[in-house]
């Protein structure tokens, strides 16, 4: 009897072994974390990082960054008509917008005036990195909850390429995008793209806005120059976003007609200009340098104020052993928001004081 059981066990083990030999190994593509300036794979990073790539965004059918982030563990997206979506990391609640740093290609844009996530078309996104928890403290004040880093598509090393797209949907929605890029000589890569959309809401509009449409336009110009052991990249983005909204409904009103106009209506109109530049160079086997700089300007035409912010971050990486290195870096930010009109304070009209913020920090990390 024992011999029969032993023979059966050998046959089963042999079959499992043969199956294992025949089954091909699926090797997943490595994901590199770009919030680390010098690049670290997700497997190697010790941070609580989630990456949503362009393929996943497309498979979700996401039309906005808010759509793309829904379903990410630990992330809550709140939206209110007429305002930018708020990303809540780690249950920050009402203070979420002050506890989450938004980066666009590594440049902080959620400063004095905040940043409208809907101004970045999903067609322009390569991936979105979400960093939650204490690992985000190196990104400065306002990162208690975490960091959302939006990485846009870089110029491709091809002679000539391009494409265009058009979508039509409910409520007179039209989305269009077009891009064109190419290589000039052996080292210069260029890319230009445009994305736009117009739409009317599910909700009805008040008479003065009845024939108006929500409208977004976004133009991107990108250039990258390849060095022998590094590169220089410059990106420019101009975007305009106009959104019409109406107020809330009481329950009786909603039950009767959920599409009807609320007790008030209004609109927001924002214009953004963003420039960022990156330089990286490998000096030798032990030393790498990296420089990130950016400028962000926002003009709110509805509230009649404007915001300007500057940012620069130089970093040096010293590799002292295999897979071990020290990174030394500095952060400098300078921002100002100016109000063009008086505001009401305790029922008294007065000139609003301008907001100013300047910060400087240094850091050193060891891996």
Feature names for model-found ranges:
Residues 1-60, 66-72, 181-182, 217-219, ...:
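N-terminal Sec signal peptide and the immediately downstream disordered periplasmic leader
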Residues 66-107:
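Extracytoplasmic beta-strand/coil segments of soluble accessory domains associated
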Residues 137, 149, 157-159, 165-167, ...:
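Periplasmic-side early beta-strands and strand-to-turn transitions of outer-membrane beta-barrels
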Residues 144, 167, 172-176, 215-219, ...:
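Residues that define the transmembrane beta-barrel architecture of outer-membrane proteins
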């Amino acid at each position: 009897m024992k011999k029969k059981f032993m023979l059966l066990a050998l046959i089963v083990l042999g079959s499992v072994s043969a199956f294992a030999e025949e089954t091909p190994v699926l090797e997943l593509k490595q994901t590199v974390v770009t919030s680390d300036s010098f690049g670290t794979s997700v497997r190697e990073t010790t941070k609580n990082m989630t990456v949503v790539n362009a393929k996943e965004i497309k498979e979700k059918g996401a039309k906005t960054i808010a759509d793309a982030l829904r379903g990410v563990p630990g992330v809550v997206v709140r939206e209110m008509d007429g305002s930018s979506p708020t990303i809540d990391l780690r249950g920050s609640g009402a203070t979420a917008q002050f506890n989450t740093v938004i980066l666009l290609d590594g440049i902080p844009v959620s400063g004095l005036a905040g940043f409208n996530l809907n101004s970045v078309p999903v067609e322009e996104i390569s991936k979105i990195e979400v960093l939650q928890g204490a690992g985000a403290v190196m990104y400065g004040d306002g990162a208690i909850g975490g960091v959302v880093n939006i990485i846009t598509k870089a110029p491709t090393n091809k002679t000539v390429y391009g494409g265009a797209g058009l979508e039509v949907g409910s409520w007179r929605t039209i989305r269009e995008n077009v891009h064109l890029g190419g290589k000039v000589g052996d080292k210069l890569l260029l890319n230009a793209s445009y994305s736009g959309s117009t739409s009317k809401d599910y909700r009805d509009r008040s008479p003065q806005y009845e024939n108006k449409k929500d409208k977004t336009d976004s133009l991107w110009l990108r250039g990258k120059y390849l060095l022998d052991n590094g590169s220089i990249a410059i990106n420019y983005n101009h975007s305009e976003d106009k959104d019409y909204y109406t107020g809330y409904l009481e329950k009786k009103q909603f039950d009767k007609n959920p599409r009807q106009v609320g007790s008030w209506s209004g609109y927001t109109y924002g214009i953004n200009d963003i420039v960022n530049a990156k330089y990286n160079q490998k000096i030798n086997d032990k030393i790498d340098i990296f420089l990130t700089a950016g400028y962000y300007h926002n003009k709110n035409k509805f509230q009649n104020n404007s915001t300007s912010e500057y940012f620069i971050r130089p970093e040096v990486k010293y590799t002292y052993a295999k897979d071990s290195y020290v990174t030394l870096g500095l952060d400098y930010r300078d921002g100002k928001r100016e109000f063009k009109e008086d505001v009401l304070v305790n029922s008294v009209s007065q000139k609003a004081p301008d907001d100013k913020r300047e910060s400087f920090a240094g850091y050193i990390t060891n891996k």
